[in-house]
Regions:
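Short acidic/histidine-rich active-site segments
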Residues: 156-169
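Active-site metal-binding loops of divalent metal-dependent hydrolases
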Residues: 25, 49-51, 163
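Ser/Thr-glycine-rich phosphate-binding loops at phosphate-binding pockets of nucleotides
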Residues: 20-26
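Active-site-adjacent beta->alpha loops and helix N-cap segments on the catalytic face
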Residues: 2-5, 27-37, 139-145
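Conserved active-site carboxylates
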Residues: 3-19, 41-46, 50-135, 168-276
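Alpha-helical structural signal in soluble globular domains
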Residues: 33-41, 125, 149-153, 218
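Conserved mixed alpha/beta core segments that line enzyme active sites in large multi-domain catalysts
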Residues: 136-158
Length: 276
């Protein structure tokens, strides 16, 4: 995302959406802010993470507390290089798995004679499995073929747009960010793209009723609250007569003072956010 999470949630709210998903690549960094923004706007947050496994793009969404634990286990092993196409299904209990059809490896597999057998192996052991359809005018025929295959082989497809910015004209902002990060000049001042937050009417243009229904099916199946206490706070013994919670706050403040970050509001606010 190139805009704050609150902006995405606000736009979704204005469109009448009642649920919204996040899935950053191999990280949960933006998730807490996203969830807080959704709660404030009375929108149901769907928590997920993108993983590239053997050159295939998977998005895993949390169904419940057990699914969250499995996601963290997968997350840990993924960053250790231990997750492969052969074993990833063992992590997916109480997770919703969406396989993107846009990756080159998926397209190559789809064009092979053994695609059906290949996809059976990829999906084996997964209870909640969908093929993610992203709007793509250039690959319109390919999308039709994937949909036809899914119907004939009883796979579920789901509306799965790739959202990077809020409006189509915001594509130029993404180019600006890329140019700055690469220290390159940007000649263009206007640009429209396709990776924006689609309106309800636009969703109906790009997707079937079944694919839109599948998004609601996923949202309805989720019963998870990220913002909750898990386990017990460690007991911090001290000579100041403070409770463990008070002493932890005290130690964090001392650390901020020692490093000089006490003078930077962003660090202080982040510390308060984590402690609360």
């Amino acid at each position: 995302m190139i805009f704050p999470e609150e902006d995405y949630v606000s736009s979704a709210k204005s469109m009448g959406l009642t649920s919204l998903a996040i899935s950053d690549f191999a990280t949960l960094r933006g998730t807490p802010e996203f969830v807080h923004a959704c709660k404030k706007a009375n929108i149901k947050p769907i928590v997920g993470v993108d993983f590239l496994i053997d050159e295939l793009l998977f998005t895993l969404y949390v169904k419940n507390e057990n699914g969250y634990k499995n996601l963290l286990r997968l997350f840990t092993d993924y960053h250790k290089g231990l997750v492969t196409l052969d074993n990833y299904a063992s992590y997916t209990c109480d997770l919703i798995v969406v396989l993107s059809i846009t990756s080159p490896k998926f397209k190559d597999a789809f064009n092979s004679d053994k695609f059906n057998y290949w996809l059976v192996d990829v999906q084996r052991g997964i209870d909640n499995f969908y093929l993610g359809i992203a709007p793509d005018k250039e690959d319109y025929l390919y999308h039709i073929q994937v949909r036809e295959f899914a119907v004939s082989h009883t796979y579920k497809t789901v509306a799965f747009p790739f959202v990077q910015y809020l409006k189509k004209e915001d594509a130029v902002v993404l180019k600006m960010v890329e140019a700055v990060s690469e220290n390159k000049p940007l000649a263009i001042k206007e640009l429209e793209g396709s990776n924006y937050l689609l309106s309800n009417d636009e969703m109906l243009v790009h997707y079937t009723e079944e694919e839109i229904h599948a998004t609601n099916e996923i949202a309805d199946s989720v019963d998870f609250n990220l913002i909750t206490k898990r386990g017990k706070l460690l007991e911090y013994k001290n000579d100041l007569g403070m409770t463990s919670d008070e002493y932890l706050h005290h130690l964090v403040r001392l650390a901020l003072q020692k490093t000089g970050f006490i003078r930077r509001h962003s660090y202080v606010n982040r510390a308060k956010y984590e402690l609360d």
